[in-house]
Amino acid sequence: MPQIQSSHSNHFDFTIDTADRTKLLMSYLVVPTTANFNNVMHGGELLNLLDKVAYVCSTRYCAKGTVTLSVDGVTFKYPIPVGNLLTFLASINYVGNTSCEVGIKVLSEDIKTREITHTNSCYFTMVAVENGKPTPMPKYEPKTEVEIRRYEGALKRKEMRTRGYLKSGKHEGV
């Protein structure tokens, strides 16, 4: 199967087999219509894109429509200037009965200097829906060390959500 891999191994430890429905790579060029007065991407625009990435990743995985249930801890670490190329690295980290966790890592590349900055990471909980009601998702079994690490991190976050709190801080496993 065709695979996608980056030459920026220190930032982009993400290999995608195009037949693997648990991972997604999407890119977006930051344009002036998405910017605020400081000529950097507006946070709301980024949130909108993150929601779309989570939707595409989860829908592609389960072959059903999905809706956003929650988003955990989006931190805006660095501004994203107009003209930069965003790369969204998304993965299915955990699947329950009708929902899944999608982890997303955002990289911003200055096209002129080729400098890459990890600007954001977050976790979306997406629910599979048919006819307005939650519906079962296909089972997921992590296979690689990275997938197992992400899965275990997702279980911890699920437990924290169940208890009604979620610690902010380092996003593991994206």
Curated annotation (Swiss-Prot):
GO terms for molecular function: long-chain fatty acyl-CoA hydrolase activity. Gene3D superfamilies: Hotdog Thioesterase. GO terms for biological process: acyl-CoA metabolic process. Keywords: Hydrolase. GO terms for cellular component: cytoplasm; cytosol. CDD domains: BFIT_BACH. The keyword Hydrolase applies. The keyword Hydrolase applies. Signal peptide: none annotated. Residues 20-132 form the HotDog ACOT-type domain. Belongs to the acyl coenzyme A hydrolase family. This is Protein VdlD. It comes from Helicobacter pylori (strain ATCC 700392 / 26695). The gene is vdlD.
